[in-house]
């Protein structure tokens, strides 16, 4: 499935959200396009609200360090009192979550803002709940690879964690259940003064990210990685080719 399909799947299968939404064709009223009009049989003559619409924009925003944005639009009737509850549940649905589609990623989501609105001339109000999307793409570079070596080093230190690039991940991975490490290459430059005819030395700067909602645990685990590297003073590189 692609990213938009997985976002739709996540929302449709969220029972706490689905229980508050209208139904269309027997399923929670979640749409990744414009909602069908009120004359469609899928509504079965019942109310069209509350309902959700998905808007996915994969245009990168360098200022916010995001690869795109996700907007979940909530529509309810003005007399309904559930819009704030649905907003809270939608935010929770994507918190501390990694989604891994077939066409990229993995991706995580950070709530950016909520914009309320009303539709003039109707009894409908709504909220646009917008998330920034961050991508945790593969960072392998060469062989031997500094990112692969660092990722395996962290996996050995924390075998029960998920290390991207080492561990397989499913469509949905909850950082609240298992901490997720991600290593990326910041810079890689040829070192001066150490090169020989058959050897070229490279200076690499790498960053380690940890997705873990427990802030105290997050700090403790990252500090342990830094301390272990400082004590060992080296990370062994595995040669991956045969």
Give the location of each predicted region.
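Small/polar-rich, solvent-exposed N-terminal microdomains that initiate assembly or binding
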Residues: 1-63, 92, 96-110, 136-189
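Glycine-rich beta-strand-turn "strand-cap" elements at beta-sheet edges
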Residues: 56, 113-124, 242
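Short, conserved charged micro-motifs
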Residues: 80-85, 141, 215-224
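Short, acidic/charged, Gly/Pro-enriched secondary-structure junctions
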Residues: 83-103, 226-237
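Short beta-strand and beta-hairpin "edge-sheet" elements
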Residues: 103-115, 228-231, 240-242
């Amino acid at each position: 499935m692609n990213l938009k399909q997985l976002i739709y799947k996540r929302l449709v299968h969220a029972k706490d959200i689905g229980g508050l939404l209208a139904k269309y064709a027997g399923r929670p009223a979640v749409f990744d396009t414009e909602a069908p009009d009120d004359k469609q049989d899928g509504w079965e003559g019942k109310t069209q609200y509350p309902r959700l619409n998905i808007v996915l924009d994969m245009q990168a925003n360098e200022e916010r360090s995001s690869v795109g944005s996700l907007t979940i639009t909530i529509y309810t009737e003005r007399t309904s009192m559930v819009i704030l509850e649905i907003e809270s549940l939608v935010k929770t649905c994507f918190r501390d979550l990694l989604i891994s589609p077939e066409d990229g990623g993995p991706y995580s989501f950070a709530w950016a803002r909520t914009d309320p609105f009303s539709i003039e001339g109707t009894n409908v109000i709504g909220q646009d709940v917008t998330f920034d999307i961050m991508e945790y793409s593969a960072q392998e570079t060469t062989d031997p690879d500094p990112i692969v070596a660092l990722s395996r080093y962290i996996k050995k230190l924390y075998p029960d964690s998920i290390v991207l690039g080492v561990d397989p991940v499913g469509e949905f991975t909850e950082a609240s259940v298992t901490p997720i490490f991600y290593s990326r290459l910041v810079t890689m430059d040829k070192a001066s003064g150490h090169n020989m005819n058959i050897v070229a030395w490279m200076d690499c700067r790498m960053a380690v990210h940890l997705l873990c909602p427990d802030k105290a645990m997050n700090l403790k685990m990252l500090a342990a990685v830094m301390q272990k590297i400082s004590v060992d003073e080296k990370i062994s590189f595995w040669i991956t080719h045969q």
